[in-house]
Design a protein with these regions (language model features):
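Short amphipathic alpha-helical segment within the helicase RecA-like ATPase core
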Residues: 1-154
Length: 156
C-alpha cells in the first residue's frame, strides 16, 4: 500500500500542489478541526489526493526541534498497521528524526506470539536513503528484545 505524508504548517501552504480540489480539502480540514498545528495528524481519503494515495496530513506548527520531530514520527508510525511505501510531501524540515520515529513505533515483542499476529510492518521510504535508520532500528529492536526477555531464558 502506498501512503503519502503531507507536512503542513498553520497556513496550510503548498497543499494545492498535492490536492485535487482545494475547496473540498479546506472543508475537510474544517470538519476535522485540522489547522496545521504542531502534532495534529488526520488521514485524508485517497480521492482528495492528486496521487490517489491515502494521505496523512501532519501539522508542523512551529516544530523545529529534532526531539519534537521524532515524537511526531512516533505518532505517524503508530497509525501504520500494514506494510507500506511512504512518500514525504512538502518536507522542508530534517526528516531523519521523523523516519526514526516511524520505524521505532513498529516495535513489537514477538517471542511469545504466533507469526501471523506479530509480524513487524515492512516500511519503505521512497526517494529517501534510510539504510542508516534501518540499522539503528534493528539495533534498538534487538536491545528491546533483550530487555523484554526473562533472564532465565537468556543463554549467556
Amino acid at each position: 500500500m502506498n501512503i503519502d505524508i503531507l507536512f503542513l504548517n498553520q497556513e496550510l501552504k503548498a497543499s494545492d500542489d498535492f490536492i485535487n480540489d482545494l475547496s473540498l480539502f479546506e472543508e475537510y480540514c474544517k470538519t476535522h478541526s485540522f489547522e496545521g498545528k504542531a502534532n495534529q495528524i488526520i488521514a485524508m481519503p485517497a480521492s482528495y489526493s492528486r496521487k490517489n494515495n491515502l494521505t496523512y496530513l501532519v501539522g508542523l506548527g512551529e516544530i523545529e526541534d529534532s526531539q519534537e520531530l521524532y515524537e511526531l514520527g512516533i505518532k505517524v508510525g503508530s497509525k501504520i498497521k500494514e506494510d507500506v511505501e511512504i512518500d514525504f510531501l512538502n518536507a522542508e524540515n530534517n526528516i531523519v528524526p521523523i523516519i526514526d520515529g516511524i520505524l521505532y513505533a513498529q516495535y513489537k515483542f514477538n517471542d511469545y506470539k504466533s507469526e501471523d499476529e506479530s509480524a513487524i510492518n515492512n516500511i519503505t521510504f521512497n526517494q529517501t536513503d534510510t539504510t542508516e535508520n534501518e540499522i539503528k532500528q534493528s539495533s534498538i529492536f534487538w536491545v528491546r528484545d533483550q530487555i523484554n526477555t526473562p533472564l532465565s531464558l537468556i543463554h549467556i
